[in-house]
Amino acid sequence: MANWPRVSPLAYVALGVLLGLTISIISQTGTTTYDAASRIAILRANRGDPQVDEHDHAHGNDPHGDEEVDDHHANFAPVQFHSNNSSHSHDGESLIADEVAKKVRVFCWILTGKQNHDKRAKHVKATWAKRCNKYVFMSSEEDAELPAINLNVSEGRDYLWAKTKGAFKYIYDHHLNDYDWFLKADDDTYVVMENLRFMLLAHSPDEPIHFGCKFKPFTQGGYHSGGAGYVLSREALKKFIEVALPDKSLCSQNHGGAEDAEMGKCLEKVGVKAGDSRDADGHHRFMPFVPEHHLSPGHVDPKFWFWQYTYYPMDQGPTCCSDYAVSFHYVNPNLMYVLEYLIYHLKPFGIDRAIRVPKNETIIHTAYSISRSERGQDDAFRDRPEVAV
């Protein structure tokens, strides 16, 4: 009989650990690249919902679903940045933006709920909302500090359409003639207001048009994602309230439904165009997810529903997004302040990004000319002649 060498018990332990690690690594291979898509697959399996449903597409199947917006630790006081009041500060850099803000007056309404006043809404107020010409939060509870309006509509996804109708009716009744454009955003949307106005400057508020992240199901000409925010011209708001909303053959009278899709259906039936919000090079300006989702190559499964929904092709990676991006969605309060810092406070020393205004032009005319040159290729009013500004 052969004399086999005696194996130490420790060797068996080491072999077991090594085998376990190997199995663990193999089992994880191929899953990390599309981590978001994996979570969605699990979600669909648990819900028995393999298809994208018209009344649920904007939420349950998102890689950054509402329940994943990490605002559990957001009950901190609004953050105030330093004033940058030094010889190398940003002082004087907003002259053009300030002039455009006088010309393109945007009323912002932010959809929220009483449970989110302290977790989200106050951080929206402390960051981008202050750059609207005027803003208000639409909720189920009044809050003079925000301020928030009580729409007397129940909370929950099943009532988003009712809230949206009520919010636009309130704005029509109180602010129609005081502003040019009317932006709807969520309390986890981050908006670069200067870039929104820059895009809108090429258009007249008398055009029946709305802009946002354009999706293609459910309508002929497209509709706009609710989470990325969408903006209606004054004429679009008038048509929605005066013509579409009172007519049950044009607008759903129910309280439920996908708010963004229902809005798109109503507007299309009264001749309001779903505009092309891309820049002249085809880069997108309204983003329905956080920056990481769009900027990181391979972040999301190519079979993910978004790629079938988007009206215009969108690259995944650094070429996705316009240098004049307008919005991102699923932005938690911490990320909101990070974006605020990166956009409005951080600057590379020695790099001058000033826009040169010719001596024979006004600031607003120069901005208008650049805005027209940056319009999307599918612009609904592209043939509209240049007007005096």
Swiss-Prot record:
<keyword id="KW-0547">Nucleotide-binding</keyword>
<feature type="binding site">
    <location>
        <position position="305"/>
    </location>
    <ligand>
        <name>a glycoprotein</name>
    </ligand>
</feature>
<keyword id="KW-0464">Manganese</keyword>
<feature type="disulfide bond">
    <location>
        <begin position="251"/>
        <end position="266"/>
    </location>
</feature>
<feature type="topological domain" description="Lumenal">
    <location>
        <begin position="28"/>
        <end position="389"/>
    </location>
</feature>
<feature type="binding site">
    <location>
        <position position="186"/>
    </location>
    <ligand>
        <name>Mn(2+)</name>
    </ligand>
</feature>
<keyword id="KW-1015">Disulfide bond</keyword>
<keyword id="KW-0812">Transmembrane</keyword>
<feature type="binding site">
    <location>
        <position position="329"/>
    </location>
    <ligand>
        <name>UDP</name>
    </ligand>
</feature>
<keyword id="KW-0479">Metal-binding</keyword>
<feature type="glycosylation site" description="N-linked (GlcNAc...) asparagine">
    <location>
        <position position="84"/>
    </location>
</feature>
<feature type="glycosylation site" description="N-linked (GlcNAc...) asparagine">
    <location>
        <position position="152"/>
    </location>
</feature>
<comment type="subunit">
    <text>Homodimer; disulfide-linked.</text>
</comment>
<feature type="binding site">
    <location>
        <position position="163"/>
    </location>
    <ligand>
        <name>UDP</name>
    </ligand>
</feature>
<feature type="disulfide bond">
    <location>
        <begin position="320"/>
        <end position="321"/>
    </location>
</feature>
<feature type="region of interest" description="Disordered">
    <location>
        <begin position="49"/>
        <end position="71"/>
    </location>
</feature>
<dbReference type="InterPro" id="IPR003378">
    <property type="entry name" value="Fringe-like_glycosylTrfase"/>
</dbReference>
<keyword id="KW-0735">Signal-anchor</keyword>
<feature type="topological domain" description="Cytoplasmic">
    <location>
        <begin position="1"/>
        <end position="6"/>
    </location>
</feature>
<feature type="binding site">
    <location>
        <position position="155"/>
    </location>
    <ligand>
        <name>UDP</name>
    </ligand>
</feature>
<dbReference type="GO" id="GO:0000166">
    <property type="term" value="F:nucleotide binding"/>
</dbReference>
<comment type="function">
    <text>Glycosyltransferase that generates the core 1 O-glycan Gal-beta1-3GalNAc-alpha1-Ser/Thr (T antigen), which is a precursor for many extended O-glycans in glycoproteins.</text>
</comment>
<comment type="similarity">
    <text>Belongs to the glycosyltransferase 31 family. Beta3-Gal-T subfamily.</text>
</comment>
<feature type="disulfide bond">
    <location>
        <begin position="108"/>
        <end position="132"/>
    </location>
</feature>
<keyword id="KW-0328">Glycosyltransferase</keyword>
<feature type="transmembrane region" description="Helical; Signal-anchor for type II membrane protein">
    <location>
        <begin position="7"/>
        <end position="27"/>
    </location>
</feature>
<dbReference type="Pfam" id="PF02434">
    <property type="entry name" value="Fringe"/>
</dbReference>
<feature type="binding site">
    <location>
        <position position="329"/>
    </location>
    <ligand>
        <name>Mn(2+)</name>
    </ligand>
</feature>
<keyword id="KW-0808">Transferase</keyword>
<dbReference type="GO" id="GO:0016263">
    <property type="term" value="F:glycoprotein-N-acetylgalactosamine 3-beta-galactosyltransferase activity"/>
</dbReference>
<keyword id="KW-0325">Glycoprotein</keyword>
<keyword id="KW-1133">Transmembrane helix</keyword>
<feature type="binding site">
    <location>
        <position position="186"/>
    </location>
    <ligand>
        <name>UDP</name>
    </ligand>
</feature>
<feature type="binding site">
    <location>
        <position position="188"/>
    </location>
    <ligand>
        <name>Mn(2+)</name>
    </ligand>
</feature>
<dbReference type="GO" id="GO:0006486">
    <property type="term" value="P:protein glycosylation"/>
</dbReference>
<comment type="pathway">
    <text>Protein modification; protein glycosylation.</text>
</comment>
<feature type="glycosylation site" description="N-linked (GlcNAc...) asparagine">
    <location>
        <position position="360"/>
    </location>
</feature>
<protein>
    <recommendedName>
        <fullName>Glycoprotein-N-acetylgalactosamine 3-beta-galactosyltransferase 1</fullName>
        <ecNumber>2.4.1.122</ecNumber>
    </recommendedName>
</protein>
<feature type="glycosylation site" description="N-linked (GlcNAc...) asparagine">
    <location>
        <position position="85"/>
    </location>
</feature>
<dbReference type="InterPro" id="IPR026050">
    <property type="entry name" value="C1GALT1/C1GALT1_chp1"/>
</dbReference>
<dbReference type="GO" id="GO:0046872">
    <property type="term" value="F:metal ion binding"/>
</dbReference>
<feature type="binding site">
    <location>
        <position position="157"/>
    </location>
    <ligand>
        <name>UDP</name>
    </ligand>
</feature>
